[in-house]
């Protein structure tokens, strides 16, 4: 669980102060092992955020400047971590709600274990197959009923490997607007 408050005070070279509050909860449910899979897990994630200063503004050099956070800190969906079928920050507004569910399987069989070059240079300890679905919505204000209407969704498959102590992943996801492929180091949930 993470509760975070981020504020830019507008000091130094900052052109606009902003405030963002967000909450994220990730939970993992072990389904145990089988003859073919050494680990089976259902991973769930919930995230919500509100750009508290979204409607505030000031006049700078004769221009009205809104106190909104940069895209990577605000209430946005799309990209490497949330709503992976959509482009980065495809949806951006004052508030957001997001849900994700992943089914993760680590097979007993490791095809990389017997390849000397891979074993020596990459040391792939395990590989993982995933199936996932995501649901989310941005909104002009943090209103629980508004944020749960006309929600966007996507679903996809992923392949992850633990190489040299780091998780590398490739995910492909589809949505009503098309599909997206993402490659990244680390699992999609922040914790």
What are these regions (language model features)?
Residues 1-122:
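C-terminal outer-membrane beta-barrel translocator/porin domains of Gram-negative envelope proteins
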Residues 55, 102-110, 116, 120-155:
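Outer-membrane beta-barrel transmembrane domain signature
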Residues 159-163, 178-191:
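Outer-membrane beta-barrel "beta-signal"
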Residues 8-17, 89-96, 149-152, 170-185:
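Solvent-exposed loop/turn segments connecting transmembrane beta-strands
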Residues 151, 155-164, 173:
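Internal helix-turn-beta structural module
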Residues 1-10, 83-88, 131-136, 166-176:
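Transmembrane beta-strand segments that form the barrel wall of outer-membrane beta-barrel proteins
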């Amino acid at each position: 669980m993470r509760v975070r408050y981020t504020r830019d005070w507008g000091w130094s070279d900052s052109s606009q102060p902003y405030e963002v509050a967000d909450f994220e909860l990730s939970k993992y449910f072990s389904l145990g092992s089988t003859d073919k899979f050494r680990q089976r897990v259902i991973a769930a994630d919930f995230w919500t955020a509100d750009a508290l200063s979204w409607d505030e503004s000031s006049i700078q050099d004769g221009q009205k400047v809104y106190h909104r956070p940069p895209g990577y800190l605000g209430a946005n969906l799309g990209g490497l971590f949330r709503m992976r079928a959509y482009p980065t920050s495809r949806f951006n507004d004052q508030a957001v709600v997001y849900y994700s569910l992943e089914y993760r399987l680590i097979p007993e069989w490791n095809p990389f274990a017997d390849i000397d070059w891979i074993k020596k240079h990459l040391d792939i300890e395990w590989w993982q197959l995933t199936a996932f679905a995501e649901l989310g919505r941005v909104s002009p204000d943090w209103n629980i009923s508004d944020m749960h209407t006309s929600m966007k969704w996507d679903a996809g498959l992923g392949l992850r490997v633990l190489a040299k102590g780091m998780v590398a992943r490739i995910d492909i996801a589809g949505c009503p607007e098309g599909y997206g492929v993402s490659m990244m180091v680390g699992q999609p949930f922040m914790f």
